[in-house]
């Protein structure tokens, strides 16, 4: 099969059409309208992509899917199309809207494929494009604001996913072999630990009927294995001995070697922020704190064995890749010597993670952080609501 923009477009639109059924499978009226919004935005990205392809072909006579520079209207259109699917700032609202609306299994599948296609496309066409460094930096910070206040824990994970995409976009912007290895490694690690967290919240939704923090708490008493696996998913984001530590170390090192100290500091802060919202706050709100089921006639049961098996295998994969970094990195696209387990990498991450956890529990203990109240956070999708796209078509 020829690897050109025509082939990319076919699969680009194919993923959009196929994935919307994962949302509609939820079977609710809200899921139907969410699916329509998702489909409109994804098809729009395809239209922009084909327009960019046509302009690029007119300018160069080529449809080769390779390195591009932002020197023409066509390549800018292609970048915008990629940016929609990669959830660039202000183009990202479909992600926290659609992912929590899907079935528990559908959310996991969406988190694996949809945005990773865009990251692959960016890495193939725009590696070393400086503007991506700054776009990615905004992506690291912007979603944390919403994730820290969101009540729906599956939406928290959707915003956390957006944050992690920012790490990959920054590395694509750096564009060195080490950075692109970091993109590939982090895409794999992110698929594993974010799938584990989405599965844990899916199990909670399956057993309790809600993923809202305002209605959860104390579940560790009846879902201890799910609680443990959720904690493992949080640790796998950047704790030594897990896959996320190896992949984030690659990205942080590539940024440091590119002499971008402010971006490096931003990524370190972003690592702390995402561990706060998804690695500490999310498990605490779901499984600990006030027991919301203490007076219930029947307590929720532990997740079914098939869910536990899927989560267990994913957790083991996170651990295996972190425990064998040389094997992990042997599958990366570039042959670059790198040691993730140096004392400075380990100490830096452990300091960031431990101080973040201590800060959360200290703030919670003194009442400075409270369980979120029911409600809807209005993101930059307020325009959609104004234009009544909530009931499009």
Language-model features: locations:
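Hydrophobic transmembrane alpha-helices and their helix-loop junctions in integral membrane proteins
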Residues: 1-8, 17-302
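Juxtamembrane/transmembrane-helix interface segments of polytopic membrane transporters
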Residues: 57, 202-206, 322-334
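Membrane-interface and transmembrane segments of multi-pass membrane proteins
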Residues: 110, 296, 303, 307-321, ...
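Generic beta-strand/beta-sheet core signal
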Residues: 159, 321-322
């Amino acid at each position: 099969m020829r690897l050109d923009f025509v082939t990319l477009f076919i699969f680009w639109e194919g993923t959009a059409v196929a994935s919307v059924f994962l949302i509609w499978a939820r079977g609710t009226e809200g899921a139907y309208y969410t699916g329509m919004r998702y489909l409109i935005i994804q098809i729009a990205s395809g239209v922009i992509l084909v327009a960019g392809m046509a302009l690029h072909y007119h300018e160069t006579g080529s449809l080769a899917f390779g390195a591009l520079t932002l020197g023409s209207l066509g390549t800018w259109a292609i970048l915008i199309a990629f940016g929609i699917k990669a959830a660039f700032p202000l183009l990202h609202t479909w992600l926290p809207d659609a992912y929590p609306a899907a079935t528990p299994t559908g959310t996991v599948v969406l988190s694996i494929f949809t945005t990773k296609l865009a990251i692959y496309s960016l890495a193939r066409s725009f590696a070393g494009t400086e503007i991506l460094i700054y776009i990615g930096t905004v992506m690291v910070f912007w979603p944390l604001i919403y994730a820290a206040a969101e009540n729906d824990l599956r939406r928290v994970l959707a915003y956390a996913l957006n944050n992690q995409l920012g790490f990959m976009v920054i590395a694509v912007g750096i564009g060195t072999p080490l950075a692109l290895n970091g993109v590939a490694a982090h895409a794999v690690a992110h698929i594993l630990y974010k799938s584990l967290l989405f599965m844990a919240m899916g199990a909670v939704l399956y057993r309790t009927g809600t993923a809202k923090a305002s209605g959860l708490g104390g579940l560790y008493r009846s879902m201890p294995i799910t609680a443990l696996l959720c904690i493992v998913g949080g640790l796998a984001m950047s704790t030594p001995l897990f896959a996320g530590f190896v992949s984030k170390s690659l990205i942080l090192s590539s940024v440091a070697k590119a002499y971008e100290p402010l971006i490096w500091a931003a990524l370190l802060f972003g690592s702390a922020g995402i561990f706060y919202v998804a690695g500490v706050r999310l498990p605490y709100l779901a499984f600990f704190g006030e027991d919301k089921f203490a007076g219930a006639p029947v307590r929720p049961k532990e997740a079914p064995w098939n869910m536990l098996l899927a989560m267990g295998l994913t957790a083991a994969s996170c651990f295996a890749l972190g425990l064998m970094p040389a094997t992990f990195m042997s599958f990366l696209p570039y042959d670059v010597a790198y040691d993730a387990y140096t004392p400075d990498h380990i100490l830096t991450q452990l300091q960031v993670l431990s101080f973040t956890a201590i800060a959360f529990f200290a703030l919670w203990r003194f009442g400075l952080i409270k369980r979120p109240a029911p409600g809807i956070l209005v993101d930059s999708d307020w325009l959609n609501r104004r234009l009544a796209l909530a009931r499009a078509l």
